[in-house]
Amino acid sequence: MKQLEKITPRDVDFSQWYTDTVINAKLASYGPVKGTIIFRPYGYAIWELIQKYLDAKFKELEVQNVYFPLLIPQSLFQKEKDHIEGFSPEIATVTRVGDTPLPEPLFIRPTSEVLMANFFKNEVKSYRDLPLIFNQWTNVMRWEKTTRPFLRTSEFLWQEGHTVHSERKEASDLTLKILDTYTEFAQNALLLPVIPGKKTEKEKFAGADSTYTIESLMHDGQALQCGTSHYFADNFSKPYEIKFQNKEGKLEHAYSTSWGVSTRLIGAIIMTHSDDNGLVLPSMVSPVQVRLIQIKETDEVIKVTEDIKEALKNKYRVDIDKTDKSFGFKISEAEIKGIPLRIEIGPRDLENNQVTISRRDTREKIQVNVNEVTNIVDQMIKEYDANLYAKALKNREERTSRANSIEEYKNILAQNQGFVLVPFCGEIECEDDVKKQTSTNSRCIPFDQDNKTEKCFNCNKDTTLKVYFARAY
């Protein structure tokens, strides 16, 4: 089949390839305001599948869904100093209604910690009121300078969880349970071989005591943060006065967390799995898992097509391309949309009671007896997903290096983008210096540490920490 000319090859211009894939797969279009996108039905369907999977996992952790307002009074936001400093350059502000100035500026939420904290303050009186474990599926706005569909947009969709607890350990444990949930989801549903770990002091969330992350490596060797979980200790409960009466009858500040993933995950899927022919989607988040295409609409072809759909529909998202387009166009469209399996049904194959099944990832075709379609589809979907994960893991492993000095680190960066594991002191000033020299930053402190004392790769101080650094989106 001819290569789709609309898509720039990855190796020619990765950035343009990404944009071409988003547009041609009809995932999104550009909005009228810079940095905004229109989620087209196919792109939004992927987000709905992400929501469905994660929401079920959250409910297993007794998370309750809520919805909080879009607007935050400036005075409320400014109570947590680190938080306001972290977000102030990106905040969009409402100052008037019609021609009437507002008595106080209102911020369009960049995140909802302060709104949740204000609610918790009024809601929590006793340890018996705790824990409160909330989540909302919503939009937020952060006025980004450099934007790209899904990866970095001024308005994006996400889930943000916010919790408050009577015990420090309970809050800290939940932070890690959520990280485990994100890790399992990324690896099993999105087929992203992520590295879970802790953020450095420089990279942790504004106002957090500690931030945990899952980091993934894209096809071009740049890292992408795919989800974060933050433990605040009492950093928010003190300025927002979230107090409760403990079991001893004394007033105590509560312990809080927040955590989130966003539509940036769609960008991660594209940049990890897709190819020069368009989108390649993991089966769990593919709006259509199996597409049936008729070569010629004879009575027998129509009947067999409907029979196959009936046999598959209880287990898979399956459709029939009934558009009035040419057979070649239908094949190209199924490819560019990343549909995992395509079944072609035509009169010639049916003479031998066969149909043709094609895999999107390898583009291999096999002829299958009509009676075996269900079993073969089961097998091929498993093989398809396993291959996507294996390819992504191979890319990460081939692009992961170790360095012991800043010179060695720079040499690696010059030759090969990817993760570089280095001994690092963890100090903010040292990381600032690394960023100034290399335009890279730390991605995470992996949980798997050897605890050997070595010299920091940049400042030469003794350290036991090993940290991943990389260029990142």
Swiss-Prot record:
Write out the function statement from the record.
Catalyzes the attachment of proline to tRNA(Pro) in a two-step reaction: proline is first activated by ATP to form Pro-AMP and then transferred to the acceptor end of tRNA(Pro).
The reactions it catalyses are:
tRNA(Pro) + L-proline + ATP = L-prolyl-tRNA(Pro) + AMP + diphosphate
UniProt lists the family membership as follows: Belongs to the class-II aminoacyl-tRNA synthetase family. ProS type 3 subfamily.
Could you tell me which SMART domains the record lists for this protein?
ProRS-C_1
Quaternary structure, per UniProt, is: Homodimer.
* Coiled-coil regions listed in the entry: none
Any idea what this protein is called? Proline--tRNA ligase
Q: Where in the cell is it found?
A: Cytoplasm
What UniProt notes about the protein's domains is: Consists of three domains: the N-terminal catalytic domain, the anticodon-binding domain and the C-terminal extension.
UniProt enzyme class: ligase
Q: Which UniProt keywords apply?
A: Aminoacyl-tRNA synthetase, ATP-binding, Cytoplasm, Ligase, Nucleotide-binding, Protein biosynthesis
Q: A GO CC term?
A: aminoacyl-tRNA synthetase multienzyme complex
Q: What is its EC number?
A: 6.1.1.15
Which cysteine pairs make disulfide bonds? none
- Give an example GO biological process: prolyl-tRNA aminoacylation
Record GO terms (molecular function): ATP binding; proline-tRNA ligase activity
NCBIfam families in the cross-refs:
proS_fam_I (TIGR00408)
Organism of origin: Mesoplasma florum (strain ATCC 33453 / NBRC 100688 / NCTC 11704 / L1) (Acholeplasma florum)
InterPro entries to which the protein is assigned, alphabetical: aa-tRNA-synt_IIb, aa-tRNA-synth_II, aa-tRNA-synth_II/BPL/LPL, Anticodon-bd, Anticodon-bd_dom_sf, Pro-tRNA-ligase_IIa, Pro-tRNA-ligase_IIa_arc-type, Pro-tRNA_ligase_II_C
